[in-house]
Amino acid sequence: MTSANKSDKDRVVIFDTTLRDGEQCPGATMTFEEKLEVAEMLDDMGIDIIEAGFPIASVGDFEAVAEIAKNAKNAVIAGLARAIPGDIARAGEAVRHARRGRIHTFVSTSPIHLAHQMRKSEAEVLEIITATVTQARNLVEDVEWSAMDATRTPIDYLCKCVETAIAAGATTVNLPDTVGYAVPDEYRRMFRTIRERVPNADKAIFSVHCHDDLGLAVANSLAGVEGGARQVESTINGIGERAGNAALEEVVMAIKTRGDVMPYWCNVESTMLTRASKLVSAATSFPVQYNKAIVGRNAFAHESGIHQDGMLKNAQTYEIMTPESVGVKQTSLVMGKHSGRHAFQHKLEELGYKLAENQLQDAFVRFKALADRKKDIYDEDIVALVDEEMAASHDRIKLTSLTVIAGTHGPQRATMKLTVDGQTRIEEAEGNGPVDAVFNCIKRLVPHEAKLDLYQVHAVTHGTDAQAEVSVRLSQDGRAMTSKAADPDTLVASAKAYLGALNKIVMKHQRDVPSAAAAS
């Protein structure tokens, strides 16, 4: 669709909740700095609304929302709040410095939620809607109200709730498929019915928020738009509660690719989607599945002989969008040990990185060290290297050196040197295999109660000298933290990944201690 043909009534507002709903995915917790970096990326790529967090949840969440609100250049910054006065006041405080702030408040509306979670009558919930939306509207001009479990709410009562919320001042009404229960046709009909029956429906923008429990989140989101919704709530890589949310990159590219049947448009710069996907994957340490639509490693790969033949003759035979349209570069072999600093910086810019001078120098030193150990350097190697460098820049615990003795007989032994808060510590330990020895060594150096929930290894690229990328998930006190690290030496990568997750647990504990003290 050309700009001349664009109509405001067909514009779809993109609401990203990666930093709130996405982070609720077990193990996907991000550090304060990672949240700021992701928010900056989302703002730069044209996301209309960034739901930056749940301010009442912890001091760390409040600080992240407040800092993102101060720094945002273009996006509306939203803070989530339950239908509780204290929540709403806290959200209002968090977004008050934003150029454009929003309070997003929600309440359950379905019979099963009212009976077993809320323990309120329908009439009581209507009173809560009026009171809380009014309170939020007195704090900010932009208020979003959500009917939790809308798709399992009787339509007559849902209409009453929507009318009440709009009358109280809601500017956006979100009707989420909270448990991923709906199918596209019924979700489309729900929006059409409500927009037809609610007398003040024209006073608010309607929004979709779909979960992927039945694998229908994106399809339902698009169906909701066809039913009259003009805001889509989604997350990068589709991360989120349970099976996740509608994947933002899939929603955006469906709108951009199928303008012939969906006359809608959005402001998102699609060439930044792949970089955003990699950034969120690195921040959460959640790998993107290889066959993931739009941003997966195999999204533009063709192995079948018939497909390859067609691609060579005309790329459109098997590609409905160009790799470049989502930020995928066609060349993969890029750098070597003779590459200079300027070429390295140029490559980083191509990959979407903007590093400070000290970060650039540190990354270049690590790149040269990697190039001395590995013959061919690929884009994926550089991404892994820089993401690890940025993630480790605030770590309290850092790996200095590691030596492992392993063989077919006898116990395996690891000797490790760590820097902990600037102090050097050295220890050795045995284990049932080299990885176990490495992890036992860390436990001796930094005593902790964290439990190892996940340990995975895969090659970043191909070849026997490929970097190993290791994912580790640790849990402690009900919190799960995941980290990834890459190195040509699998044991070094394993140690770095374990330490990365441990650093996240330490940092999360530090930020949440004031919250616990304040609550007591």
UniProtKB/Swiss-Prot annotation:
SMART domains on file: LeuA_dimer
Keywords linked to the UniProt accession: Amino-acid biosynthesis, Branched-chain amino acid biosynthesis, Cytoplasm, Leucine biosynthesis, Manganese, Metal-binding, Transferase
Reaction catalysed by this enzyme: 3-methyl-2-oxobutanoate + acetyl-CoA + H2O = (2S)-2-isopropylmalate + CoA + H(+)
Alphabetical GO biological process terms: L-leucine biosynthetic process
Disulfide bonds: none
PROSITE patterns given in the database record: AIPM_HOMOCIT_SYNTH_1, AIPM_HOMOCIT_SYNTH_2, PYR_CT
Pathway of action: Amino-acid biosynthesis; L-leucine biosynthesis; L-leucine from 3-methyl-2-oxobutanoate: step 1/4
Enzyme's top EC category: transferase
Subcellular location: Cytoplasm
Binding, Mn(2+): D21, H209, H211, N245
Main localization category: cytoplasm
Entry annotated with the keyword Metal-binding: yes
UniProt GO MF annotations: 2-isopropylmalate synthase activity; acetyl-CoA C-acetyltransferase activity; manganese ion binding
Database matches in InterPro entries: 2-IPM_HCS-like, 2-isopropylmalate_synth_dimer, AIPM/Hcit_synth_CS, Aldolase_TIM, LeuA/HCS_post-cat, LeuA_allosteric_dom_sf, LeuA_bact_synth, PYR_CT
Cofactors: Mn(2+)
Positions of region (Regulatory domain): 398-520
Pfam family of the protein (one): LeuA_dimer
HAMAP family per UniProt: LeuA_type1 (MF_01025)
Function of the molecule: Catalyzes the condensation of the acetyl group of acetyl-CoA with 3-methyl-2-oxobutanoate (2-ketoisovalerate) to form 3-carboxy-3-hydroxy-4-methylpentanoate (2-isopropylmalate).
Subunit record text: Homodimer.
Name used for this protein in its record: 2-isopropylmalate synthase
Organism: Nitrobacter hamburgensis (strain DSM 10229 / NCIMB 13809 / X14)
Record lineage: Bacteria, Pseudomonadati, Pseudomonadota, Alphaproteobacteria, Hyphomicrobiales
Gene: leuA
